[in-house]
């Protein structure tokens, strides 16, 4: 395990990462995500050097590497890369984080029943059965007025300590791009009045409380990570019904019915390597949206000697598609899946998109395993 990485930035990292065998059935989450980032047939950055860090055991059975070590490892990986002889610099490090911290409402991992809700603190005011919101103290009323969800078994868990580790990695030059989460909750800005919104409920006779609009580590708004929400797969360009949203989202990207490589189930590969045992399947989630951004950013970074998290944010700010999403076509309340609530009207776009004929673009060639040079010509051709 990575147990001896130094935090002083002076000594080389020591320790190793070990992986234990696990016979549990996988849902191929990481494989699908990696295929979107850099897969040869369905990915963006087809010539990227790929490195995998197993953050969890078999998804989602639990933490594998301590969250407090993940970002130390990324910092060490980035800071002590071998200098590229072509550029005289270390290559940029673009990372995707399609995972997030969660809390469960109870040990049975069941959805929170409305009957167990004691109160909601919303923008500094406490609401309860004696002081209801405008829509009344009912489940639908609380959802409409305050954006609390009762159909989910868990909520996003933000950690200031982990967020500080993420920021350290960003400050050291690592680009961190991550999924917003799939709770259909607002992710507030730390400076606004929704940051301290909390829910208070009972379980087994004890009172419990959680902030519910702070997002989840590592992609929370109290660090500079790039937070990606999911775009629906309709021509109206609405946000996906499951995605977290709000003022702390940086950009939306396709996240519904995304086709990528899979395990040993799904659609067998009959186009490129029939009989090879390769399979592809579709998946939904902000986990599928985030690697779209990471892949495009990695492709862009191939033309840069230096590429930081700030550079990536700047690119997304300047070159995403603006004001083309459909928001607030319904009531505009928290219970309306089209509500904007401060979300950016902005989604990922590549100016030099894939072929317009055929389902996908044919592979350009096999990825090299040695002799990689940097930088390579970017496949993006954006206009200033």
Describe each region flagged by the PLM.
Residues 1-69, 83-94, 103-108, 171-173, ...:
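Subtilisin-like serine protease catalytic core
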Residues 52, 82-99, 103-108, 225-227, ...:
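C-terminal subdomain of the subtilisin-like protease fold in secreted/lumenal serine endopeptidases
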Residues 56-220, 274-291, 329:
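Substrate-binding/access-modulating region of protease and related hydrolase catalytic domains
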Residues 11-27, 78, 157-161, 167, ...:
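N-terminal domain-start motif of subtilase-like serine proteases
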Residues 34-37, 51-58, 95, 255-334:
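Hydrolase catalytic cores
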């Amino acid at each position: 395990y990575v147990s001896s990485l130094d935090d002083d930035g002076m000594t080389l990292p020591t320790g190793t990462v070990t992986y234990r065998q696990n016979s549990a059935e996988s849902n191929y989450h990481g494989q699908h995500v990696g295929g979107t980032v850099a897969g040869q047939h369905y990915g963006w950055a087809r010539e990227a050097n790929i490195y995998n860090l197993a953050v969890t055991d078999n998804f989602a059975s639990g933490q594998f590497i301590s969250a407090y070590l993940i970002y130390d490892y990324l910092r060490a990986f980035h800071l002590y890369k071998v200098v590229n002889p072509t550029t005289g610099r270390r290559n940029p490090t673009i990372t995707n984080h399609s995972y997030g911290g969660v809390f469960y409402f109870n040990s049975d991992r069941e959805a929170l029943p409305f009957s167990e809700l004691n109160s909601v603190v919303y923008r500094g005011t406490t609401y309860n059965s004696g002081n209801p919101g405008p829509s009344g103290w009912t489940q639908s009323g609380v959802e409409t007025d305050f954006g609390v969800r009762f159909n989910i078994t868990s909520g996003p868990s933000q950690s200031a300590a982990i967020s500080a580790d993420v920021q350290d990695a960003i400050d050291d030059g690592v680009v961190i791009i991550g999924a917003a989460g799939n709770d259909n909750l607002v992710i507030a800005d730390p400076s606004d009045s929704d940051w301290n919104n909390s829910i208070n409920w009972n379980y087994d006779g004890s009172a419990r409380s959680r902030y519910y609009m702070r997002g989840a580590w590592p992609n929370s708004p109290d660090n500079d990570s790039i937070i990606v929400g999911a775009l629906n797969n309709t021509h109206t360009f609405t946000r996906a019904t499951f995605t977290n949203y709000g003022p702390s989202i940086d950009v939306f990207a396709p996240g519904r019915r995304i086709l990528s490589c899979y395990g040993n189930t799904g659609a067998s590969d009959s186009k490129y390597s029939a009989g090879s045992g390769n399979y592809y399947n579709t998946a939904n989630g902000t986990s599928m949206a985030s690697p779209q951004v990471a892949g495009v950013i990695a492709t862009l970074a191939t033309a840069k000697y230096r590429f930081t998290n700030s550079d990536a944010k700047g690119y997304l700010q300047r070159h995403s598609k603006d004001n083309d999403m459909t928001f607030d076509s319904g009531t505009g309340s928290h219970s309306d899946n089209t509500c904007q609530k401060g979300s950016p009207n902005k989604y990922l776009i590549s100016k030099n998109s894939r072929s317009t004929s055929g389902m996908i673009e044919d592979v350009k060639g096999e990825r090299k395993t040695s002799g990689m040079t940097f930088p390579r010509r970017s496949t993006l051709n954006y206009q200033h």
